[in-house]
Structure formats: structure tokens, C-alpha cells
Amino acid sequence: MHFVEKEPDQKRIDFDQKLKSNKILRIPGAYNPLTAKLIEEIGYDAVYVSGGVMANDLGFPDIGLTTLQDVSTRSYLISRVTNLPTIVDIDTGFKSVSYTHLTLPTILRV
């Protein structure tokens, strides 16, 4: 399997620089690693992982049934095949505001 050269921290720095450029960014959605690779090869600026599309791909309606593990695992599989920054829809944050201390570090490792 193809792994990328850039670590998540470098991808975040790159994305921050793109945001500061004040240019319109093109960020299509990817629901699997192959789509993410194609997005990078075509020349887009980043990859978006949709919570709704991910839920549907797992066989769930988009009503908050995916877990943090579902989202972090799928997002990791997608982000590891591209040097582009990956924006992940973490839906409702999984459970409550007090759960944020687990959600954010988990997703930031993606």
C-alpha cells in the first residue's frame, strides 16, 4: 500500500497556508482511499471526508450512528494515501461536549 511522505502536522501547516492565501480552495469529498488518491492526482487542494457519506457507506442512515472508531479508522485509511490535508466531518462530536477531550486528539492523529 502507498503511504505518504507528509505527517499530519505538516498537512495541517500546509492547509493553514492555503487558507491564508485567500484563494478559493477546491475540496471534493472522498469516501475511500482510492477516491482520495484520485483527488490528489487531479490537483485539488484538500480532501473532505463527509460524515453522512461515511455513515451511508457503512450501511447507516445519517442520524449520528457512526462511532468515533468508525470515523477515525476510515479517515485514517483515506488520509494515509494522500499528501493533501484531510478535513473530517466529526458530526456531533460523538456523545457530548465532555467527550471532546477524546474526539479531538483521536481525529488530529488522522
Model-assigned labels for residue ranges:
Residues M1-G29, L38:
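N-terminal amphipathic alpha-helix/helix-capping segment at the start of soluble metabolic enzymes
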Residues D62-V88:
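Alpha-helix-loop-beta-strand connector modules within alpha/beta enzyme cores
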Residues N32, I39, D89:
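Conserved, mostly hydrophobic/aromatic
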Residues T100-T106:
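Conserved small/polar residues in nucleotide/adenosyl-binding loops
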Residues R26-G29, V47-V49, T86-I90:
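Hydrophobic faces of well-ordered beta-strands that scaffold small-molecule active sites
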Residues Y48-D70, T92-S96:
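Glycine-rich, proline-tolerant flexible connector loops at the mouths of alpha/beta enzymes
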Residues N22-L25, Y44-D45, T82-L84:
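Short, well-ordered coil/turn segments that N-cap beta-strands
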Residues L38-V47:
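Catalytic domains of carbohydrate-active enzymes, especially glycoside hydrolases
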